[in-house]
Amino acid sequence: PHGGRAIGSREMLDIREAEYGGEMLYINKSKHHPMWAMEYCRDEGLRKYWDEYSYPYHKNGEGNNSFRSAMTNKVQKKVDARAYNHNQDSFTIENVIRWFDYWRERPGTGDRVSSGGVKIIFSDTNTHYRGVENYRRSGVTDAMRIPKDPFYAHQVMWDGWVDIENPRIHIVGHWNYKEDVVKPVYVVSSAEKVELFLNGKSLGNGQRDYHFLYTFKDVAFVPGKLEAVGYDKNGKECCRAELQTAGKPE
């Protein structure tokens, strides 16, 4: 009310008038202002590309081999652009991997701390892009604000900061495939252990990586209900999610 206030932005930790500061692609902590990680994952992926087993059967990473640089405004040819043409399963995994670096460096007992994260590109938007489409698809929602899988992954990872306050779980993707499909199933959860069930039969516990990612390899598709159950350190169920096979459209 008395003036002297300013909004924050990236690289403003040394500006006393800023209300917050942030970083792009770097891990940092602040002594004076709340410090938010902002652009820790620049990868891109279309919402309609589920995985390689789903229509339109987009091969993960397939697309352009050049893009226009936002810094030089020149086309960079013959570059590896796979990171900007993800399917949703690999896009979700990449977001988990990138955020884990920041979560691992979360606040301790010192006087320089990190205050969490924000998504600088929350929804797909008409800013500089690197994928085959002519707009940026780094968002956790598409341009119509329809959530992608990383939206739900962030709900899991961001429910609390120093420690998880409410255990959550999310099964990546859907459960509608051809009968001969055998594929990995990915689950994002803050639980200590995750067990997968298919039509009530246990498929065992997932391999845990990057704290939040659980992988179940070579799961053969069978129509019905796919359930993921998360357990706390005492072995008690703390969260549950399910996917149900949909019928064929009429």
Go through each PLM region and give its residues.
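Short coil/turn motif common to extracellular beta-sandwich-like domains
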Residues: 179-186
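Short proline/glycine-enriched turn/loop motifs at strand-loop junctions of beta-rich domains
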Residues: 187-193
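Short beta-strand segments within Ig-like beta-sandwich modules, predominantly Fibronectin type-III
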Residues: 203-210
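Exposed aromatic-hydrophobic patches
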Residues: 213-219
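Extracellular Ig-like/FN3 beta-sandwich strand-entry sites
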Residues: 221-225
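Edge beta-strands of extracellular beta-sandwich domains
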Residues: 235-247
